[in-house]
From Swiss-Prot:
Belongs to the G-alpha family. Its cofactor is Mg(2+). Residues 284-291 are annotated as: G4 motif. Residues 186-194 are annotated as: G2 motif. G proteins are composed of 3 units; alpha, beta and gamma. The alpha chain contains the guanine nucleotide binding site. Interacts with COLD1. Interacts with TUD1. This is Guanine nucleotide-binding protein alpha-1 subunit. Residues 41-54 are annotated as: G1 motif. Disulfide bonds: none annotated. The helical domain (69-189) is required for self-activation. Residues 38-380 form the G-alpha domain. The gene is GPA1. It comes from Oryza sativa subsp. japonica (Rice).
Length: 380
C-alpha cells in the first residue's frame, strides 16, 4: 500500500515537472511569435554586381556593432584575391585588345612587364595563392603603371573589371604591410559573390530606442544560378528592396557576356513585380552606383543601352547628369506601373538615388525608408 502511494507520488511529481516544462516551452514559443510579429522582413534583390552586398555591409556598420577585428582580418585574403583578379583581367584584356583594335599598338605591354603579367595571372588561377608582400606589390605596381595597362583600364566596362580596381591599386603598399588589418572602407570595397542567403537584424534609429522598428534584411546571390534560392523567401515579406546599378548600362553580364546588364535588370525587376506573393508588398528601388554613373555619362552615351535608345542628351556637365538620371528614373517608374496589375498600383513604391559606398547617404536613405514604412502601417 505504502509502496503504491510512493509510486503514485513519484508519478505525480514527474507529471508536474513535465507539465511545467511543456508550459515553459509554450510560453517561449508565444514570446518568440509575438517578437516575430514586430520584426519587419526586408528582401534585398537585384542582379549580380548591383551593389546589394555593399548595402548589406553598410547596414552592419551603421546599425549594428560593425566588424570586429577577426571579421576584418577574414577579408584580407578576399582583398588580396581582388588585386590578383584585377591585374589578371587587365593583363588578359590588354593582350586581347592588342589583337583586335585598329590602334592596337597602345595596348602592347613591354616585354619585361609581359613576364610579370604571366606570373601574376598564374597566381590568380591558384587556389593557394600567396598573400601580397612587398615583392609581389612591386610587380603589381610595375604592371599597373604600364601605359598599355592604363589604356586597358579605360576600357574596363567591357572587361568585367570590378568596381574596386582603382581603390585597391591606389592602396597597394598598405595592403601588403606586415600585420595588415583591413579597414572598414577596405571591407566595403572588397568583392566576393554572395552564395546562399545571409541575414541581419537591425533598427535604423538605433538598437536601443524604445519602440523602434526592427527589420530583418535578407541578401541573396544575384547571379542567375543563385536566383532559384529566392522563391522560398518571398512569403511574408514586408518590403522588397531592389538594387539596380544604373552605371552598368554599357556593360555585359559576368555569367553571359552577350546580355546587357541593364536589360537583365529591367527583365528581373519586371519578373519580381509580377510575383503573386508581392501583391501587397512595398517596393523600394535603389538606383545605385550613382557615383560611377555621373562620371560615365559624360563619356558613354546612355543610348548604347537598347532600353534607353530614345534618350536625347541636352548639355555637358552636371545638368546632363541630372537629365540622364531623371530619364532612367522615369523608365523604371513606367516599368513599375506597366508591370503592376491595377489592384497593386497603390502599394508603396519609392525610388532612392544611392551610392552604396557612401555611408551617410545609406544611413539617410534607410531612415527615410523606416519613416515611410511606419507611416504606411499607420495609414498616414
Amino acid at each position: 500500500m505504502g509502496s503504491s502511494c510512493s509510486r503514485s507520488h513519484s508519478l505525480s511529481e514527474a507529471e508536474t515537472t513535465k507539465n511545467a516544462k511543456s508550459a515553459d516551452i509554450d510560453r517561449r514559443i508565444l514570446q518568440e511569435t509575438k517578437a516575430e510579429q514586430h520584426i519587419h522582413k526586408l528582401l534585398l534583390l537585384g542582379a549580380g554586381e548591383s551593389g546589394k552586398s555593399t548595402i548589406f555591409k553598410q547596414i552592419k556598420l551603421l546599425f549594428q556593432t560593425g566588424f570586429d577585428e577577426a571579421e576584418l582580418r577574414s577579408y584580407t585574403s578576399v582583398i588580396h584575391a581582388n588585386v590578383y583578379q584585377t591585374i589578371k583581367i587587365l593583363y588578359e584584356g590588354a593582350k586581347e585588345l592588342s589583337q583586335v583594335e585598329s590602334d592596337s599598338s597602345k595596348y602592347v605591354i613591354s616585354p619585361d612587364n609581359q613576364e610579370i603579367g604571366e606570373k601574376l595571372s598564374d597566381i590568380d588561377g591558384r587556389l593557394d595563392y600567396p598573400l601580397l608582400n612587398k615583392e609581389l606589390v612591386l610587380d603589381v605596381k610595375r604592371l599597373w603603371q604600364d601605359p598599355a595597362i592604363q589604356e586597358t583600364y579605360l576600357r574596363g566596362s567591357i572587361l568585367q573589371l570590378p568596381d574596386c580596381a582603382q581603390y585597391f591599386m591606389e592602396n597597394l603598399d598598405r595592403l601588403a604591410e606586415a600585420g595588415y588589418v583591413p579597414t572598414k572602407e577596405d571591407v566595403l570595397y572588397a568583392r566576393v559573390r554572395t552564395n546562399g542567403v545571409v541575414q541581419i537584424q537591425f533598427s535604423p534609429v538605433g538598437e536601443n530606442k524604445r519602440g523602434g522598428e526592427v527589420y530583418r534584411l535578407y541578401d541573396v546571390g544575384g547571379q542567375r544560378n543563385e536566383r532559384r534560392k529566392w522563391i522560398h523567401l518571398f512569403e511574408g515579406v514586408n518590403a522588397v528592396i531592389f538594387c539596380a546599378a544604373i552605371s552598368e548600362y554599357d556593360q555585359m553580364l559576368f555569367e553571359d557576356e552577350t546580355k546587357n546588364r541593364m536589360m537583365e535588370t529591367k527583365e528581373l525587376f519586371d519578373w519580381v513585380l509580377k510575383q503573386r506573393c508581392f501583391e501587397k508588398t512595398s517596393f523600394i528601388l535603389f538606383l545605385n552606383k550613382f557615383d560611377i554613373f555621373e562620371k560615365k555619362i559624360q563619356k558613354v552615351p546612355l543610348s548604347v543601352c537598347e532600353w534607353f535608345k530614345d534618350y536625347q542628351p541636352i548639355a555637358p556637365g552636371k545638368q546632363e547628369v541630372e537629365h540622364a538620371y531623371e530619364f532612367v528614373k522615369k523608365k523604371f517608374e513606367e516599368l513599375y506601373f506597366q508591370s503592376s496589375k491595377p489592384d497593386r498600383v497603390d502599394r508603396v513604391f519609392k525610388i532612392y538615388r544611392t551610392t552604396a559606398l557612401d555611408q551617410k547617404l545609406v544611413k539617410k536613405t534607410f531612415k527615410l525608408i523606416d519613416e515611410s514604412m511606419r507611416r504606411s502601417r499607420e495609414g498616414t
